[in-house]
């Protein structure tokens, strides 16, 4: 079966790379914020291949903004989902890369993905990162809004994926 989930992309590939907020237990210790080097490498590889890329670092843009979870057990550090949507509204894009670095972040990342896909149903949604690499089948079943998972180092795979989309070839 051929997969043409990218059929809505007709005017060139325009990509946003999103680093989501970080979630930690409310009463736990927080490690220092680490820069998203993997996303920086992916963005650089795509830019060098002449793809249009914009980045949103939801943690880096608001590292001290705390949002307490409804059950009062967790703290999200970074932009809220509403703020992420506001950032996206100022960008023209048809492909969204989302990084899931840590399994503890999956619940908030899944919620953000579902919210974004509801607001932008025609985007092509790509996920990568350590959590995705560790359990891609689970992630795609748990969040069917994901179109493709990139496993392991993402630089070459991301470039190959966008070339495939740009050339309107099958993903299979």
Residue ranges and their predicted role:
Residues 1-9, 87-88:
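Short boundary motifs at domain starts and secondary-structure transition points
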Residues 6-8, 12-33, 124:
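Short glycine-rich His-centered loop
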Residues 10, 32-34, 115, 166-167:
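Short, solvent-exposed amphipathic alpha-helical segments in soluble enzyme
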Residues 24, 35, 151-154:
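Active-site-proximal structural scaffolding
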Residues 31-35, 102-105:
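Aromatic-acidic/polar surface patches that form glycan- and anion
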Residues 32-47:
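Short catalytic helix/loop segments, enriched in acidic residues and glycine
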Residues 45-49, 54-172:
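Glycine-rich beta-alpha loop elements in corrinoid/cobalamin-binding modules
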